Amino acid sequence: MTLLAAHLNDAGLLITDGERILCREPGYALLKDDGLVTGREAWATASLEPRRTKNHYWDDLRTASLADARFQHLTAADLVSRQLETLWQRVAKPGDRLALAVPGYMNAENLGLLLGIAMDLDIPVVAMVDAAVAATRRQYTNAVPVHVDLSLHSTMLTRLLQEGQAQFERSAIVDEAGMLDLYGIWLRMIAESFVQQSRFDPLHTAETEQMLQDRILDWLAIASTRETVPIEIEYRGIAHQAEISSLDFVAAATPVYQNIVSNLRALYRAGETPALQLSDRAARMPGLADTLKARVGGAVFLLEAGATARGLVQRCVESRPGSAVTLARHLPWDQAPVSVDVGGREAAAQPTHVLLGNHAVPVGGAALSLGTQTSEGERWLDLGPDVPGVSRLHCDISTVDGQCVVTDHSRYGTFLNGHRIDGSAVLQTGDVLRVGTPGVELRMIYVETTHGT
């Protein structure tokens, strides 16, 4: 009669008893002629039979029929039910109970349906906790923690409160920034390297494409520890080889990483020190931790494999028999706190000017106010009298503790690289600042000054 914990992230559905990882597999389903299979078996043939494969059902858990003609007799709930049943039968013994760590991409409707599926399968679910909260087992003194994890199709960023325990505050789901998005980028890069170095295109056939997919995690591990990655696949008795710089993996992923950075920076207010807590999945992505450290600042903490489920099984508060299971968004810490150096806030270049159209205005010295109505005695960037979505005093840009900071004063919002800020945010060179909705866009730039005699 053991308490087990499951982390239901479709990039790696995982169950643990607190000591061992009992199973881990991706959220993949394959409709074969003789039935439905899920997990590793479906992943192993995803490139060979793409039209028979589904991987979007955990993050789109519904009871509507699937659109694909081959799957019209099934729903996403059917696929989740089959995979959950298979996992439970593989690891559970009579009398075992299950606690669920659920990812941020699952909404209240998804969670209600998930609990219904578990009930139909006679799986005794005794607790359900936000995954980021379950993963956060210690206090980050002098800092604000954000948990970073990747699913198949998105990156999940969760900002946590630290009022005596780990507590959910708010989150951001970054679409098109998941494991499969990164895999696709890297597989295309690897294929191009084969073409250039050995005149062999591994994406020409489904069989060799599947070979690349099967080996991608091994190559990523090498890219995280060595300067170059030797790559070899054998096809029809011939070995094909290529060598890729590890930095090329990071460069190829830059658009995805930058999207994550932009969303992450919008979660922090000016003056806050980030404590970036990365899941082992996020930590395995070449250059991601270093990119976040360089562009967001603060300190980076890397979690071990299975940390979310282990953190849940050790701290779980089980529901009373007969009572309904509801989503918990707070748990006590059970590990010693760690102190974060407040000096590591930002490392990126600080802007010197804000550019509106073709007009650049310095942002050093006294605060620069932005809005539709000037105020006597203040530095003012007039955005015009009739700009929709812009307040009279919308925001201001000032230097605070050596950082360039935007502070929002509006009803309509101030947006940093497309994401609404929460009160204030630190600005960097290259940032796009949108004032209001639809509002006005401005760019933060660095102007180098030269002094001669």
Predicted features, each with a name:
Residues L160-S245, D280:
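Phosphate-binding glycine-rich/basic clefts of nucleotide- and phosphate-handling proteins
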Residues V300-E376, D382, P388:
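Acidic, glycine/GT-rich loop-and beta-edge segments that sit at the periphery of enzyme/chaperone cores
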Residues T75-T141, Q162:
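Active-site neighborhood for divalent-cation/phosphate handling
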Residues A11-A101:
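Conserved phosphate-binding loops in N-terminal lobes of ATP-dependent enzymes
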Residues I222-Q335:
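Helical "lid/coupling" subdomains associated with nucleotide-phosphate turnover
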Residues H359-I445, T450-G452:
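Forkhead-associated
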Residues N55, A67, V325-S339, G436-T453:
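Regulatory inter-domain linker segments that are low-complexity and enriched
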Residues M1-E25, A29, R138-E169, W186, ...:
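Gly/Thr-rich phosphate-binding beta-strand-loop-beta motif of the actin/hexokinase/Hsp70
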